[in-house]
Each structure stands twice: as structure tokens, then as C-alpha cells.
């Protein structure tokens, strides 16, 4: 009984504290501007709408020009599969820190899954293809096309789809408690696909980017 009373006070207190820090303090660590990312994305889309590789490399160069050493330039050797929420795609980690990550995510063949519930705001800018999304009370899908930015707020959930048989790639920015998002990215690998090689590479690249950020003074 005492434990129950304690938890009914402690859990809301911790939740409120986390929300307060996120709303009024964590934002001070953010370096990436969602509107700027969308602007840069549209510039690359205008040049390479039908060439995924050229589009991603051009956008990577623009991101490096804008954000400098915060960005790891895209290359062919550090792409990894990502299984999360029942969806499967491939990703390249452009930046990772304790308060933000920036990745290329997508698939040449389509996928569908659950967004997850995250202590972060997510900005998903479509670069090629289209994404469909629906919240629990949506009776029609929301459609996002190249240049559109799908904003997924902290704590919300959605079903999403990159339609089967179609390539779809996006620039994804998450801002919030990034470490709290990591289990969502690892659970399928641990308990479903058992793809420990991909898990190792994901942890290796993520930890490396985070360490780089810390050494640069970026939380």
C-alpha cells in the first residue's frame, strides 16, 4: 500500500519534471532548425527529384555547409538496416547527440509500421516517394510528398506507410530525450530479427556520433 501511494506521487512528479526540462531547458541544446532542413531538402529535390543517390549526396553537402562538423557526410559504407515498430528500412546517421539526431531513412521497396511513442518531437521531411500516415482517429490517410514535412509531436502515435513497391526516402530530425528512443530501435533486433550484426553496427555508429558530439560540447 505504501509503495502504491509512493508510486502515484513519484511517477507523475518524474513525468512532470521531464516535461518541464524538455520544454524550458532541453531546447537550449538544439542546433538544428526544422524549417532550414526543409528548405535545404527542397533545394536538393529541385535538382535531383528522380535520382535518390545524387539527391542524398547533394543534401549531405548542403548540411555540411550549414552545420559543419555536426554532420557526418553520407557515404556508402555506414548505411545500416533499421527494424522498429514492425517497419524495416535503411538509415544513415548524419548526427547523433543526447538531445538530437538527424538521419537519412528510407527504403527502395516500401514498408509499414508503428511510429512508436517517444519523448521527442520528430520532423520527417520527404525527399523522394510518398509517406502515408494515420492517427487512431483518422478515417483517411494523410499523404506527404517530396518537400513536405511530417511533424510528429512528443508522445503521439501513428501508423505510417511507405507504399509497397515504391522507393521512399526522408530526412528525419528528432529533438528531445534521444536516449529514451533507443530501445524502440533495438527491440526488433533483439527479440524478432535476431540480427545482432546490424545491432552492433547501429550501436557502434550511434555511440561514435554521440561521443563526437560530446567532445564538441554538444549535448
UniProtKB/Swiss-Prot annotation:
The keyword Translocase is annotated on this UniProt entry: no
Phenotypic consequence of gene deletion: Abolishes the production of ergosterol and leads to the formation of more than one septum in some cells. Leads to susceptibility to cycloheximide and to staurosporine, but does not affect tolerance to nystatin and to amphotericin B.
Pathway where it operates: Steroid metabolism; ergosterol biosynthesis
Name of the protein described by the UniProt record: C-8 sterol isomerase erg2
Coiled-coil positions: none
Entry keyword Ion transport: no
GO cellular component: endoplasmic reticulum; endoplasmic reticulum membrane
Gene that specifies this protein: erg2
Catalysed reaction, written as an equation: fecosterol = episterol
Amino acid at each position: 500500500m505504501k509503495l502504491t501511494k509512493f508510486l502515484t506521487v513519484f511517477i507523475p512528479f518524474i513525468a512532470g519534471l521531464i516535461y518541464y526540462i524538455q520544454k524550458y531547458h532541453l531546447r537550449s541544446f538544439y542546433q538544428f532548425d526544422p524549417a532550414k532542413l526543409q528548405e535545404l531538402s527542397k533545394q536538393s529535390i529541385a535538382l535531383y527529384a528522380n535520382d535518390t543517390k545524387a539527391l542524398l549526396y547533394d543534401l549531405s553537402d548542403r548540411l555540411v555547409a550549414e552545420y559543419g562538423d555536426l554532420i557526418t557526410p553520407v557515404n556508402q559504407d555506414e548505411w545500416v538496416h533499421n527494424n522498429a515498430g514492425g517497419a524495416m528500412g535503411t538509415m544513415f546517421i548524419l548526427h547523433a547527440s543526447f538531445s538530437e539526431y538527424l538521419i537519412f531513412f528510407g527504403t527502395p521497396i516500401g514498408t509499414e509500421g508503428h511510429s512508436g511513442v517517444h519523448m521527442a518531437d520528430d520532423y520527417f521531411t520527404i525527399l523522394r516517394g510518398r509517406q502515408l500516415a494515420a492517427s487512431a482517429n483518422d478515417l483517411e490517410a494523410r499523404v506527404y510528398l517530396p518537400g513536405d514535412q511530417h511533424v510528429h509531436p512528443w508522445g503521439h502515435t501513428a501508423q505510417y506507410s511507405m507504399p509497397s513497391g515504391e522507393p521512399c526516402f526522408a530526412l528525419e530530425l528528432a529533438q528531445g530525450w534521444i536516449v529514451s528512443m533507443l530501445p524502440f530501435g533495438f527491440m526488433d533486433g533483439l527479440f524478432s530479427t535476431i540480427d545482432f550484426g546490424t545491432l552492433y553496427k547501429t550501436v557502434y555508429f550511434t555511440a561514435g556520433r554521440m561521443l563526437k558530439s560530446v567532445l564538441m560540447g554538444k549535448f
